[in-house]
Design a protein with these regions (language model features):
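Polytopic transmembrane helical bundles with strong interfacial aromatic enrichment
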Residues: 2-143
C-alpha cells in the first residue's frame, strides 16, 4: 500500500489502532470457540487445554481493547484532526474532563466503550473461576463479542 505522508501527519496511531482492532476480533473469536470446546469436552485434560487457550486468547483480546482505548484517547487528547473521529467529535476548546466524553459520542466510540466494559466483566469472570466455570465464562464472553 503506497501512502502519501503529509507534513505533520500522524499515521502511526491509526495503524496501531487498526492492528489492535483486528487483533481483538481474532482473539475474541478464538476465546469464544475455545470456551465452547472446553465446555463440550468430556476429558479433563482436553478441557483444561482448551480453557488455557481460551484464557490466553481472552487476555490478549482484553489487552488489545484496552490499548485501542488508549490509542483513541491519544488521538482525541492530542487533537489529531486527520482522523475523522477526532475531527467530528472533539474540539480544541474542550476542557480536559470533556475530552473523555468524546469516546461515546460517536457510534465507533460507543462500540469501543461497550467492548471495554465487556472485557472488564470477562476479566472479573475469569478471576472468580471457582464460582464461575468455563461454561458461564464461555456464555458471557461469547455473548458479549458475537
Amino acid at each position: 500500500m503506497n501512502t502519501t505522508k503529509f507534513i505533520d501527519e500522524h499515521l502511526y496511531p491509526g495503524q496501531i489502532g487498526y492492528f489492535l482492532t483486528i487483533l481483538s476480533l481474532i482473539a475474541s473469536l478464538v476465546a469464544t470457540y475455545s470456551f465452547a470446546k472446553a465446555f463440550f469436552s468430556k476429558e479433563i485434560s482436553v478441557q483444561a487445554a482448551w480453557e488455557k487457550l481460551a484464557k490466553i486468547a481472552f487476555i490478549i483480546e482484553s489487552l488489545a481493547v484496552f490499548s485501542c482505548f488508549i490509542v483513541l484517547f491519544y488521538i482525541i487528547s492530542n487533537h489529531l484532526f486527520e482522523y475523522k473521529y477526532a475531527y467530528m467529535h472533539s474540539d480544541k476548546n474542550l476542557p480536559f474532563e470533556y475530552l473523555l466524553s468524546c469516546f461515546w459520542e460517536g457510534q465507533e466510540g460507543s462500540f469501543l466503550l461497550w467492548s471495554f466494559w465487556h472485557c472488564v466483566l470477562g476479566v472479573v469472570l475469569l478471576a472468580t473461576k471457582k464460582k464461575w466455570g468455563s461454561s458461564m465464562a464461555g456464555v458471557k464472553i461469547g455473548r458479549a463479542h458475537v
